[in-house]
From Swiss-Prot:
Reaction catalyzed: alpha-D-ribose 1,5-bisphosphate + ATP = 5-phospho-alpha-D-ribose 1-diphosphate + ADP
UniProt name for this protein: Ribose 1,5-bisphosphate phosphokinase PhnN
One GO biological process term: organic phosphonate metabolic process
Keywords from the named record: ATP-binding, Nucleotide-binding, Transferase
Domain of life: Bacteria
Functional summary from the UniProt entry: Catalyzes the phosphorylation of ribose 1,5-bisphosphate to 5-phospho-D-ribosyl alpha-1-diphosphate (PRPP).
Family named by the database record: Belongs to the ribose 1,5-bisphosphokinase family.
Length: 187
């Protein structure tokens, strides 16, 4: 049974690495695809593999209804393409890299989605943000403040601890995705 699995978490929680690890483990196991995001950020900016768009191209796509979900964060625009609807209609479960701030809109558009909040202690967030070298000290502090923001509560919200070894946590996320896909349950 197809499901939309909405992964979210603060910068530095390890979403990109965790999703990449889970994707490797699910490659031949399940009818699951991982959606790419359209972002107004250069393709070589590091982090996830995404489709880089100019602001003008993003706005054009947005105005034509080509995004199933979209939001703004940290000075960039993010979109998830409408292709996810076709994938789910064909029986595939879809994993998306979402935003905590956009969860409410995502739940309105896809009430059956499974929201998964990637959670790590603040000291690990600080270490990871510093190690990736994309932000200065002030930007790191701002991201840590934002990390404390409340998440829209959803009855099926899964809080996923990502403070352990990547291989172990990636396997656990792959297991959650596989269980959700096979059983059709939300949690």
């Amino acid at each position: 049974m197809s499901k939309l699995i909405y992964i979210m978490g603060p910068s530095g929680s390890g979403k990109d690495s965790l999703m990449a690890e889970a994707r490797l483990r699910l490659a031949a196991e399940a009818p699951v695809v991982f959606a790419h995001r359209y972002i107004t950020r250069p393709a070589d900016a590091g982090g996830e593999n995404h489709v880089a768009l100019s602001r003008a191209e993003f706005q054009l796509r947005l105005s034509r209804g080509l995004f199933a979900l979209s939001w703004e964060s940290h000075g960039f625009a993010y979109g998830i393409g409408r292709e996810i609807d076709i994938w789910m209609e064909s029986g595939l479960s879809v994993v998306v890299n979402g935003s905590r701030g956009a969860l409410s809109a995502a739940l309105q558009a896809y009430p059956e989605l499974l929201p998964v909040l990637i959670d790590v202690p603040e000291h690990i967030l600080r270490e990871r943000l510093g190690a990736r070298g994309r932000e200065d000290a002030g930007e790191i502090e701002a991201r840590l403040v934002r990390a404390r923001m409340a998440v829209v509560e959803a009855p099926e919200l899964v809080r996923f601890d990502n403070s352990g070894p990547l291989a172990e946590r990636g396997q656990a996320l792959a297991g959650l995705i596989l269980e959700t896909t096979i059983s059709g349950r939300k949690s």
